[in-house]
Regions:
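C-terminal ends and interior cores of transmembrane alpha-helices
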Residues: 60-79
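Symmetry-related core transmembrane helices of the 12-TM Major Facilitator Superfamily/SLC fold
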Residues: 146-164
């Protein structure tokens, strides 16, 4: 999804001409909707184990990204912003913002079931994101529609990979997952440590996300005389940043296993 998400803010503001207020509204509604889908995905996937109906849903959304972005989302944002806002939040929440967490959770279940290191496997996802971000800036400077069609193409590849994965032990994994009850949710909200963690996330990750996804891409691309050059160079910069992230993801599990998580 780095083929379009890494330059999402630049596309919205530079190509579609949205205001800063509209941009912030889009991001906030997208994130709020994704939270609802995350809770749904978490409960359902815990019961499914390694069964893949939700992964199939995500596959179809990836394939439909190109047509949706070009023929539905882009025209609606320019002609009927509110409708485009709602449809986009539902689409991105199902397939990307919450879908990314779903895929991480699914991979973690596979790691425990097949006894491989999740962090090292997850690093390959970051390497893939870095490659996508590198070319995203180049293609965006030509036409953003190229990026959207490429997402659909790779979504079809993802679907074919999904078809090839047939695990005979998924029933066992699903059986090990206990049912989530209403009391479990209430207990979490009564836990003081949970609210301390929420405040920590709001004060760190949330503000960093605003800077990283909304402010910095537009600011950096605007430093150059040509908007296309700025978009291309931002893709290079973002790619290098994610490569470093992937390297740390690959080596940190070995360090954590040696010194312990708390240390």
């Amino acid at each position: 999804w780095s083929l379009w998400w890494s330059s999402y803010a630049i596309w919205l503001k530079g190509h579609l001409g949205l205001t800063g207020t509209e941009l912030g509204t889009l991001y906030s509604v997208n994130q709020f909707t994704s939270i609802l889908f995350m809770m749904f995905y978490g409960i359902v996937q815990d019961k499914l184990g390694l069964k893949k109906p939700l992964i199939w849903c995500m596959s179809f959304i990836l394939v439909l990204t190109g047509p949706f972005m070009i023929y539905v989302y882009e025209p609606l944002l320019q002609s009927n912003f509110s409708v485009g806002l709602i449809l986009g939040a539902l689409f991105f929440g199902l397939g990307y913002l919450a879908g990314c967490g779903l895929l991480d959770s699914f991979t973690e279940k596979m790691a425990r079931n097949f006894h491989f290191e999740y962090g090292t496997a997850r690093a390959w996802g970051s390497f893939g994101y870095a490659i996508g971000a590198f070319f995203a800036g180049i293609f965006f400077s030509i036409s953003p529609h190229i990026n959207f069609w490429l997402v659909s193409l790779f979504g079809a590849v993802f679907m074919m990979i999904n078809m090839r994965f047939k695990d005979k032990d998924h029933q066992c994994v699903a059986a090990d997952a206990g049912g989530v009850k209403k009391e479990d949710f209430i207990a979490v909200f009564k836990d003081r440590n949970f609210w301390v963690f929420v405040i920590f996330i709001v004060g760190t990750w949330s503000f960093y996300n605003i800077f990283d996804q909304q402010l910095f891409p537009v600011f950096y691309a605007g430093l150059f005389e040509s908007h296309d050059v700025g978009t291309r160079l931002y893709g290079y910069l973002n790619s290098f940043h994610v490569v470093l992230e992937a390297l740390y993801m690959a080596i940190i599990p070995f360090f954590v296993n040696r010194v312990g998580p708390k240390n």
